[in-house]
Amino acid sequence: MDPAFPGVPDLTASADLQMLGGLCPTNAFSSDGIDLGRCVFCGLCAREHPEMIKFTPNNKLAVDSRDKLIMAPGQKALPKIEFRLPFSLRRSFALRNVSAGGCNACEMELAASNNVNFDISRYGIDIVASPRHADALILTGPINRNMAEALSETWQAIPEPKYLILCGTCAISGGIFAGAEAINRAFLKHWAACLFIPGCPAHPLSIVHAIASIMGRR
């Protein structure tokens, strides 16, 4: 992994969270630590205060519940992914992507995860065109109003059992668009995700590792 890659942050135990929070464009800092579901990995905090925080090249950023994305000061790694798909899906897992109002960076990285360098299909993971052929929906983008209905219809078209994966900071929290008038995230109040892959955009290796993990392949 490129040493310059901004992966899992190393937040010192003595970090001034209020000071770091004053720099953050997405309000990722709180009294609990740094929320990787909000962080866009811009690196401003690390550039301004390298004595408090730095980003390591560790690309294992995904977790299986939203609250696990909050890293406390002094915490060195994220909890391991414990969720596992049923055995019937551990050798073949089909994903339908819905791009819901994002910038297309996460979509490009998701597509790159299937190229010759990362080859996600070697683990039996396929990205399919029809929701009727899918086992899961992988959501990218903050969910704008114009895509809310299409997202819901796509989800309804996926046969049971089905799973929801949130890929990228925008999908997880709304990212830089959180709270905007054009955003409608009501869908996520009704359906729970089994996997959260942060990043702006999410790196192909983070995507591959995360999905392979819930298949019991990593």
State the predicted function of each range:
Residues M1, S14, T56-N58, V98-A100, ...:
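Fold-independent oxyanion-binding glycine-rich loops
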Residues M1-D10:
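Flexible, acidic/Gly-rich N-terminal and inter-domain linker regions that tether
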Residues L11, Q18-V63:
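Iron-sulfur cluster-binding cysteine motifs and their immediate structural context
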Residues D16-L20, G102-C103:
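Cysteine-cluster motifs in flexible loop/terminal segments that predominantly coordinate metals
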Residues N27, G33, E160, A182-I183, ...:
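Ferredoxin-type iron-sulfur electron-transfer modules in oxidoreductases and energy-metabolism complexes
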Residues A46-P131:
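Flanking helices and flexible, charged tails adjoining ferredoxin-like Fe-S electron-transfer domains
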Residues M108-L110, N115-F118, G124-H209:
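Cofactor-cradling patches in redox/metallo enzymes
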Residues A210-R218:
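C-terminal alpha-helix
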